[in-house]
A protein has these predicted regions:
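Feature captures the catalytic ectodomains and active-site-proximal regions of enzymes
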Residues: 11-12, 21-22, 57, 92, ...
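Two-component/phosphorelay signaling modules centered on CheY-like receiver
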Residues: 13-31
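Acidic catalytic/metal-coordinating carboxylates
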Residues: 34-38, 62-65
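Active-site beta3 strand of CheY-like receiver
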Residues: 47-53
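Active-site residues of response regulator receiver
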Residues: 55, 83
């Protein structure tokens, strides 16, 4: 490892010789300065300085003045302030000046070493620790994985995998990343078997303790919050994966405390017209078709499939005996989000305000269709990064800040996630087969039954049955459906895109977050 060069500025340098020798013995080169002006000259002349130890109380330029000038010369240069003063305003000024650390005299050499390691070696040490810790956890997760896990155990496994993915994002050395990807793929293989074995049983009352699903979410989780709140906002961010929630969580936590973080399971297909309509209606698709034929549209029907979400919600609330004043808004672009954020005061008179945010879903589709977005979100870390960038500059964050100031409780959830698809599964169908790449429904489907979850009788899964011989098939793991005609072109176009509609951890295990204002 290369030696780091440290500039130490202090007007009592003679007294610090033992400390300098100690640093030399630990592998640091130390350049000294006895004033702020001398320190600035050295910074100007020597681009090889890696960090500065800066005394706060020096004759001439003070430490704080020197700090400001160093940052003008080299904003990236870490400065560790050393001072006798414990006055709070000096600490505040130093922190405001973007110091890397703050040490109170008298300092012992080990304190300085610790501060330098924290400042200069943080990323390397964190990276090494991340890889070491994941190696330990790898075996534990591997032993846990099987299709015999309970729903709650699958939630724990998925949380661990996402945790390590986000830790690997921060690590410089990604030596264990390929191992993590393989373990996630194995988890998805087992999760597919779990869903295949249990999904229909959950819906048909054959499991005494089924997980909360799209159509039971509001009744099981949200209505109790609504009952005890004067005013509450339900924010449904379409297509928000659990990992995407975890990266925007720290930003939200500046304004809100996470009261409860839960994961629920999306119904199949994990597509907006099915999952989000189920969420708002409290009904499965075949039940919506039967009870509300004027609002429900099947895959073959023309027109928008999510045009009656507010109607579905009103009907569910009525069934549950909840007569509340509510608003419903759907945001599909920046201008719409900005306009809604500006009207928060008008919404405060409602007990319930529902906001559907479509951006993340649009990003997923744009990632497929637009070359520039494909390059910006080439893989999952990049996809998370672009989500974070959107959120930090979105009207949604502005709205959340306003709601926090008004002390309003909010719930953030989603309808389904999305998965990064890589491998094609061949399927044949007639001209009426739907276009989704992760599920197909039709009367003349030809496929390899080992590569899909097939629902031969849609009624078993409470899905619409458009023809006597209709069936549904769902893609597993990271697969996507492709037709034999023009197969190679189709595969090249859709491989490495983000799709939803099928069965994977990322699509089905999704966040439901209750937040209270700070």
């Amino acid at each position: 490892m290369e030696k780091n060069t440290i500039l130490w500025a202090d007007d009592e340098m003679e007294l610090l010789k033992p400390h300098i020798l100690f640093l030399n013995n630990k592998g640091y080169d130390v350049i000294t300065a006895v004033s702020g002006d001398e320190a600035l000259d050295i910074v100007k002349e020597n681009r090889g300085i890696d960090a500065v130890l800066l005394d706060e109380n020096m004759p001439g330029l003070s430490g704080l003045e020197t700090l400001a000038k160093i940052k003008q010369l080299r904003a990236d240069l870490p400065v560790i302030m050393i001072t006798k003063s414990e006055e709070e305003h000096i600490m505040d000024d130093a922190i405001g000046g973007k110091i890397a650390d703050y040490l109170i005299k008298p300092v012992n050499p080990n304190q300085i070493i610790l501060s330098l390691k924290k400042t200069l070696d943080n990323k390397r040490l964190v990276s090494e620790k991340t890889n070491t810790e994941y190696r330990k956890e790898f075996g534990q997760i591997g032993m846990t994985l099987s299709d015999n896990l309970k729903w709650s155990e699958w939630v724990d496994v998925f949380k661990k995998i996402v945790y390590w993915e986000l830790e690997m994002d921060k690590a410089q050395d990604k030596g264990m990343l390929d191992v993590l990807k393989m373990q996630k793929a194995d988890a998805n293989t087992q999760f597919f078997k779990f869903v295949e074995k249990n999904y229909v049983n959950w819906l048909n009352g054959k499991d005494a303790n089924p997980p909360t699903m799209s159509h039971t979410l509001l009744k099981n989780k949200f209505i109790p919050e609504l009952d005890k709140s004067e005013s509450i906002f339900l924010i449904v961010i379409d297509n928000l994966r659990y990992d995407q929630w975890k990266i925007i969580q720290p930003v939200i936590q500046d304004y809100y405390k996470v009261e409860n973080e839960e994961l629920y399971i999306s119904i199949l297909p994990t597509a907006t017209q099915y999952a989000r309509n189920a969420l708002f209606s409290g009904l499965m698709p075949s039940e919506m078709e039967k009870r509300h034929p004027d609002w429900w549209l099947n895959d073959e029907d023309e027109g928008g499939k999510n045009m009656h979400e507010e109607d579905f919600l009103q009907a569910q609330l009525k069934r549950l005996g909840k007569d509340v004043k509510l608003s419903y808004n759907k945001v599909t672009n920046y201008a719409g989000g900005k306009k809604l954020a500006e009207s928060i005061n008008n919404l405060m008179q409602n007990k319930l305000n529902v906001i559907v945010y479509n951006f993340v879903d649009m990003l997923s589709h744009a990632r497929t269709e637009m070359e520039v977005i494909r390059e910006l979100a080439d893989d999952e870390p990049a996809y998370r990064s672009i989500t974070m960038s959107w959120f930090e500059h979105s009207p949604l964050l502005d709205m959340i800040k306003q709601l926090a100031a008004k002390k309003v409780k909010i719930v953030i959830t989603t309808d389904h996630g999305t998965v990064h698809v890589k491998e094609p599964t061949k399927v044949l169908g007639d001209k009426n087969v739907n276009t989704n790449l992760r599920y197909k429904q039709g009367k003349a489907l030809d496929y390899n039954a080992k590569e899909v979850f097939e629902v031969k009788n849609p009624s078993d899964a409470f899905l619409p049955k458009l023809h006597p011989s209709s069936r549904f098939i769902f893609a597993k793991e990271d697969r996507f459906f492709a037709y034999p005609n023009n197969f190679n072109h189709y595969v090249n176009y859709y491989r490495n895109t983000f799709q939803h509609g099928g069965i994977s951890l990322e699509e089905m295990i999704i966040p439901y977050i209750t937040l209270s204002p700070r």
